[in-house]
A protein has these predicted regions:
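Acidic low-complexity segments
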Residues: 2-16, 22-34, 78-165, 197-234, ...
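A generic local secondary-structure boundary/capping motif
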Residues: 13-15, 42-46, 119-122, 130-136, ...
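N-terminal alpha-helical targeting/anchoring segments
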Residues: 33-89
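Conserved alpha/beta core surface patches that mediate binding of polyanionic ligands
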Residues: 33-51, 147-172, 315, 368
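Short beta-strand elements
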Residues: 48-60, 163-189, 311-313, 385-392
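Short, acidic (Asp/Glu-rich) active-site segment that either coordinates a divalent metal cofactor
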Residues: 64, 171-197, 275, 317-339
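Internal metal/ion-chelating core segments
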Residues: 162-262
Length: 451
């Protein structure tokens, strides 16, 4: 693993080769093991060490070029700088490009597990064996992926900025299908520590869903009360983070914009719902890089120090995301990215939520999520790996999958109950922490034949 001094030396070397006014360097070192399995057997395993240096060069008139190199040699770094500077020379100026950040005070995060960093892939084999044993015992077919990684990252620029961080991560996800391929169950788990992965417990979840999902019934599309499991909630919440962009809100292009003839007309910032209660009191959405379950970094894409920020607090919109350009234009303090999202929960179990629903649907997770209407943050997607009828507080029949159209903001506005949150790896935005929830009038638009 690259030490702090080694990362510093690499950045200094790159900056030393730079001839343009601006040079920003990002260094990534990763050691990882993975095991892939399918058809009830291990198909692939690997141990890899990768290193990458990303170089961004900036001219005096705000032209930028970027190059990425995978070798840490003088020749490779020099060529990377030259490529970045050549690209900058032919790029169009970006009037919104901001001056390089000076030295920052980055927080110290505790998401490095020494055991996970030191072991190899053999420690993950028992978890895979537990999943495969469960599949064989129940005459199902398992496929999945398990991995662990140790990472060192660093950033620096000509203005004196420097940051260094190490973290570990691990995950196990898999699906179970019946031999006929008509039913699918899924389970996933991720953690900073590979010791937390539990293949036997995961297999129980996926097996139960797969066996319960055989002989699915068709249900007419429409609006239903739903219990969304944490994976489904995290997929929605991950998309919602981008909707807190202050520029969109102030220019009338967001669900956080108030109706105004001035918004987006070049007459300054329009009114927003900042400080107003748009959600039930049980809804609190925040960014928390210090959360022990998240493999966060001390900085975001803007390179500003990561910090705890409440976006929604007890139903009230507390903050908007200001990038450096829009913050300067609006006279505001820039804020870090809407990353490391945590949707707080309540002291309920998934069983408690199901028991409180007279008639509705239990949804495992979503996929193929796309934006339909950016202003209202309307999304569309599909359910997968288990949709079940809830009747009189009990899970009954398996149901075919659906296509849905929904705004995650409106889903939270209609939420009535939550469980305790867990870490979930989302389909599109990486790990977040989310609970299961009950929401009403979830809009299913058509039946999907997907399993």
């Amino acid at each position: 693993m690259f030490s702090q001094q080694e990362v510093h030396d690499i950045i200094d070397r790159v900056i030393g080769y730079s001839k343009l006014p601006g040079c920003e360097v990002s260094v990534q070192w990763t050691e990882d093991d993975f095991i892939r399995f399918a058809n009830n057997g291990i198909t692939t395993s690997a141990f890899r060490v990768t290193q990458q240096v990303s170089i961004t060069s900036t001219t005096a008139d705000k032209r930028r070029g970027n190059a990425v190199v995978g070798e840490i040699t003088a020749e490779a770094l020099k060529n990377g700088v030259k490529q970045a500077e050549d690209l900058a020379a032919i790029s169009h100026p970006n009037p919104e490009d901001m001056p390089a950040l000076p030295a920052q005070s980055y927080p110290s995060l505790s998401n490095f597990d020494g055991y996970t960093a030191s072991v190899r892939g053999d420690v993950m084999v028992p978890q895979v064996q537990a999943v495969l044993a469960g599949a064989l015992k129940n005459k199902l077919v398992a496929a999945g992926f398990i991995q662990r990684s140790a990472n060192a990252v660093g950033i620096g620029n000509k203005a004196g900025l420097f940051g260094y961080h190490t973290y570990t991560d691990s995950s196990l996800s898999h699906t179970m299908r019946n031999a006929e391929g008509t039913s699918s169950g899924w389970a996933s788990q991720s953690s900073v520590s590979v010791k937390d992965l539990d293949g036997e417990q995961q297999a129980r979840v996926s097996i139960e869903k797969c066996l319960r999902g055989i002989n699915r019934k068709k249900l007419d599309p429409g609006k239903y009360t739903v219990v969304l499991e944490p994976a489904a909630v995290a997929d929605l919440v991950g998309w919602l983070g981008a909707a807190f962009d202050a520029r969109d809100a102030e220019q009338g292009q967001s669900f956080l914009s108030k109706p105004s003839p001035e918004a987006g007309q070049g007459k300054g910032a329009g009114p927003t719902f900042l400080g107003e209660k748009l959600f039930p009191e049980i809804i609190t959405l925040r960014s928390d890089p210090f959360h022990p379950k998240l493999a966060s970094t001390p900085w975001g894409q803007s390179l500003l120090p990561s910090e705890k920020i409440s976006w929604i607090e007890r139903g009230v919109v507390r903050n908007l995301y200001y990038d450096r350009f829009w913050a300067e234009k609006a006279g505001k303090k820039p804020t870090p990215d809407t990353a490391n999202l945590v949707l707080d929960g309540q002291d309920n179990s998934l069983s408690d939520l199901i028991a409180s629903v007279e008639r509705g649907l239990l949804v495992t997770r979503f996929w193929y999520i796309r934006v339909v209407q950016p202003k209202t943050w309307q999304l569309t997607g599909l359910t997968r790996d288990g949709v079940f009828m809830i009747e009189n507080g009990k899970v009954t029949d398996p149901i075919t999958n659906f296509r849905w159209n929904e705004s995650p903001a409106e889903v939270l506005q209609r939420t009535t109950k939550l469980t305790q949150p867990i870490r979930v790896n989302t389909v599109d935005s990486g790990p977040d922490v989310a609970p299961a929830l009950i929401t009403t009038d979830f809009n299913f638009t058509s039946i999907s034949d997907a399993v």
